[in-house]
Amino acid sequence: MALWGGRFSQESSALFKLFNDSLPVDYRLVEQDIVGSIAWAGAITQVGILSEAECQQLQQALKELLGEVEEKPELILASGAEDIHSFVELSLIAKVGDLGKKLHTGRSRNDQVATDLKLWCKKEGQQQLLLLKALRQALLELAERELDAVMPGYTHLQRAQPVAFGHWCLAYVEMFERDISRLEDALKRADTCPLGTGALAGTAYPMDRYKLAESLGFASPTLNSLDTVSDRDHVVEICSDASISMMHLSRMAEDLIFFNSGEAGFIDLDDEVTSGSSLMPQKKNPDALELIRGKTGRVYGSLIGILTTMKALPLAYNKDMQEDKEGLFDVMDSWAICLEMAALVLSGLKVNRENTLSAAQQGYANSTELADYLVAKGMPFREAHHVVGEVVVKAIAQKKPLEDFELKDLQSFSEIITSDVYDCLTIESCLEKREALGGTALPQVRAALATKLAASE
């Protein structure tokens, strides 16, 4: 039975019902719909629609219903109801009879679903924050284990300058901390209660919406009914935050996939996060990381979907908004499993220090140090840059690192070079010089790690 049948002289076609019904998606809002209905029963009691006894009877029946669907969630989809609101209301009527028909007084499914969705976003958002913080902790623990392992840093995927592996870990800590901050901000903006704004013009009953908001755990009520029932900014914003976070996850996955490759051999991944080949018995594939990278596009698609759905909707509510949930639910599911999987990958990751050090010593990563050495001797940097470029050309031709050149050969490029030049060409020197705030010198990395660990306690 539909909640709106009185206006119509014939029933909906089976095809329209299949097309229109949203229960297969919005059943996930059952807890929020029941909690909102319990609060609404209290609100309409305060304005005289229900007696205290009726309110208690309705609220008790709703609590019983919540227990039943938690124990047997299959009851929801088996009901054949149009949507989760219809399921809850019809189930309530089945329990308490005509009294259940009073519950929807002054309420529309428009403010009802807006409330359900915000309650769901608030709850699930808190779970995502916990997962983000767990991933941050996994990175911090990895940084502690492998802080002083030396590896090549890259620009353009070409070896550039040596960095500490702990510095690499802390780079991603910075990214995920921004994700935490963004999501916390989004949840603050979502912390306003839509209930009591009706279909679009507000409710005709003089209820205390501040008290209603407080009863549902919101910071305050919304202030404009037209905006309230048509607002899905919180969905867009959470999908956007998830997309940015998935970008960070995908970048980290890409780094680790490369580090794990036979060509690099920088890290080993645990067997529990890898798989093999059905044909090639030697293969150990980084499937967990590849799936994180793959699921990122899926999350982006949901963000574009909700933006496109909302971009041309007039005030106030439109049925298009029914399409807001499937993408949101998929975003949150995908984001959550990727955060969990990334943390698991990091927990078992081991750095092959000999390989990372060997790679850092190749590719003339100490060229910048030689240029800085010349600057310290009084040569303008642009000239020093040119001189070192010529040295590198000769080094490549002779297939030897800069530190293997004899002094007289280096002096043929500049007479200001003396025997102390070799002190600046070591890997250790390359790291030690980067001691300004944010640099990769080991004391800086240790200090940054200590600060992050203290903040995470």
Swiss-Prot record:
Under PROSITE patterns, the record lists: FUMARATE_LYASES (PS00163)
Q: What Gene Ontology cellular component terms go with this record?
A: cytosol
Q: What's in the keyword line of the UniProt record?
A: Amino-acid biosynthesis, Arginine biosynthesis, Cytoplasm, Lyase
Pathway where this protein functions: Amino-acid biosynthesis; L-arginine biosynthesis; L-arginine from L-ornithine and carbamoyl phosphate: step 3/3
Is Lyase found in the keyword set?
A: yes
Q: Where does the record place it?
A: Cytoplasm
> Can you provide one Gene Ontology molecular function annotated for this UniProt record?
argininosuccinate lyase activity
Q: What are the EC numbers?
A: 4.3.2.1
What Pfam families does the entry give?
Answer: ASL_C2, Lyase_1
User: What general EC class does the enzyme of this chain belong to?
Assistant: lyase
Its BP terms in the Gene Ontology are: arginine biosynthetic process via ornithine; L-arginine biosynthetic process
Carries keyword Transferase?
A: no
The reactions it catalyses are: 2-(N(omega)-L-arginino)succinate = fumarate + L-arginine
Family (UniProt): Belongs to the lyase 1 family. Argininosuccinate lyase subfamily.
NCBIfam families found in the cross-reference section: argH, PRK12308.1
- State the PANTHER family in the record: ARGININOSUCCINATE LYASE (PTHR43814:SF1)
Q: Which HAMAP family match?
A: Arg_succ_lyase (MF_00006)
What this protein is called in its record is Argininosuccinate lyase
Q: What's the source species for this entry?
A: Shewanella sediminis (strain HAW-EB3)
Q: What gene codes for this chain?
A: argH
